Amino acid sequence: MGVARSVRMRTKSLFAAALTVSLISATGCSDDSESDDPEDSIFVDDSKADDFYSMSAQEYLVEGKSTIVLDASFATKTVDERLREAKRIVGLKQIAIAWFMTQYLVDKEHDDPNASFGGFGGMAKAGAYEDLEIRERADKLTFDFVFRQTAAGGKNLMMSLPIRVAGGKQVFDLEIGKPSNAQMNELETNHEWYRSAPWSGWNPSTASADQKEKITFSIVKEKVSTDGFFDIARLTADGKLDMDVFFGWDYHSDYHLKHSKQFFTWLKEQGFRSPTTSWDTLTPTSGAFTKTVKADGRDVKLEVRIYFGKPGTTTDPDTDAGGKLLENIALESLKTRDVIMYSGHSGPFYGFAIANWKKTEEGDLDDADIRVAQMPADRYQVVLAEGCDTYQIGTAFKENPNKAGKNIDIITTTSFSDASSPAAVQQFVSALIARDSTGRLRPQPVSGLLTKLDGNSFSFQSLYGMHGIDDNPKLVPFAKSGNFGKTCGVNADCGGPGNLCVSAGTGQGKKCTAACASLGESGCGTGYTCKAVASQASSTIYGRACAKL
């Protein structure tokens, strides 16, 4: 990738990553992937449960007014021609607004040229634009418009911004850059206008008056999404769950080599059969690590493949040929695999840097590539974008025409990520293949994984989140809803993992139900609601289950 300016460093944690035990411990999964549900479950009344559900990030709706001016030659064009050109330029201006807003909100490294400008752990969601009220002025060249964009940051973002109240709205002022129409039109991949000074590393304090304009942005919190399960039933419907992992080139300490080797060892420790005797002999054609598990009474084959740039081989990350091979493998993965994982460097308006971008323009998948990549339209896929500031990649995947916002889940960050270990990849795989003590897949809610990912770094906040969760199952996959309400003695009486035998209270006996993801959310069916459940022995809430109204 020849645009190193846009690639953010992944930060090395000052402390070793560690996992913590939470009150809802069953929503996660340990490294051995065992996840048994307690046999002494009891429903907890709403008034007795802590009213607390947390994810680290929040989306916000940002709105403002701006102006564009057409080339003088359009003064003699028809109304329709002028409006058509105005809409085109407004689209380019939306990209510019998103870029400069991201430059303000995003966290900075101490040596960044604009390290003193903003830095709130936030980003604009590139691509999530709305153009409102485009109006032509009397000169027939100037058009005013209202824009609306989505941004993301920590839940306290609005407390951190220099907010004031105007017209009954919470607003903040920001000086953005004023590239010309011709400059904004320069969007060739890897050579976009915003990758050059003074727009890259934007800092209005160092820009001349004719290079900037002040815009007032209103900001409100977006509607909060609720928890859901990874749709393991769909991922395993064909009897196989295949996963590809890409470790991007790293300049910190060759972490693409170290982490791929650690992950190789970890897979073997999890009981996977290795395709080769050692990491040293692993090549792109070695094949998959394999393991067979049970899912809803069926055998399911797990396959995991590892890819990274290895010096002196066909995937040498310093060469065009090596980078191109890695890029082609990644594109094939997006086309054919259930799960695609990337761990490496990234940044705003960027994507996956698999090869050494300092030496080759090959071996990268940026947001523009992702939007047009061949992906299956009717197949559910899950993507992990583990790197700094990958939030915008979520929109790129959802806007791929073969996905159109469906059949895709993408986990991203809105701030730094930890470069010191492959823990995030291991936790992600563990969540997808979480099993009970008999080796049966036990689908997990997304919140458990996000909590673990956020906990990997102690010197900074990563702000992980998942795009696409609104259409994920709220009822645990493989739930036997036909057994709801039947008398039971143990969980196994009600079905496989995730089906529970729960007491409604003292003297009321135990009835069959199943795990659910969000309190009060639909998914349980008519006559049921989702309530917290606790282990009577430990007196701790461990999850949620469908309760009869």
Model-derived features: positions:
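Bacterial N-terminal signal peptides that target proteins for export
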Residues: 3-16
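Bacterial Sec-dependent N-terminal signal peptides
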Residues: 23-42
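Active-site-proximal C-terminal subdomain of hydrolase catalytic domains
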Residues: 381-481
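Secreted, cysteine-rich disulfide-bonded mini-domains of extracellular proteins
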Residues: 480-549
